[in-house]
Amino acid sequence: MGLREKNVLALLHERTEKYSDKVALGMKTKYGWKEFTYSGIGLLSRKIAHYLISELNVQKGDRLAIISESKPEYGACVFASVISGMITVPLDVKLTKYELKSILSDCEPSVIMVSAAHYAMAKFLQEEIPSVKAVILMDEPSCEIYDKSVYQLP
């Protein structure tokens, strides 16, 4: 099967098998350099998808909004969305809260995944948009959890 005939899930599986221990993504954080291997991205994607399905009871066709700067977890969230059958709604971090509210009111996401830098915005949107049943913080486990209504990546 050629590259053109493969879907995203097939490519994710193939790459995690073929390049398992090779570094797929890396970035500098305030805690130092952070790297994800291909198998690490695949594992994190599957864990997030499992969490979305088993804990948040998302259904195929539900929408997952992502508000975050570019980071390795962003890619894992997109893959998790595909694995769980959700529709990904990537949002530009430069949009105003009113622009975000307008977009999300229209697409009605059930979950918002957000980096810590945009946490306050996500909480505002959760209060304003009835379809949003959960906000998930994408940052590292050492990041402070702001309140009990916010979930964190597994």
Residue ranges and their predicted role:
Residues 1-4, 34:
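Acyl-group handling in specialized metabolite and lipid biosynthesis
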Residues 3-24:
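A short N-terminal helical cap/helix-turn-helix that marks the beginning
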Residues 21-59, 65-71, 75-79, 96-101, ...:
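Conserved AMP-binding/adenylate-forming core of the ANL superfamily
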Residues 60-61, 88:
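Alpha-helix N-cap/start motif
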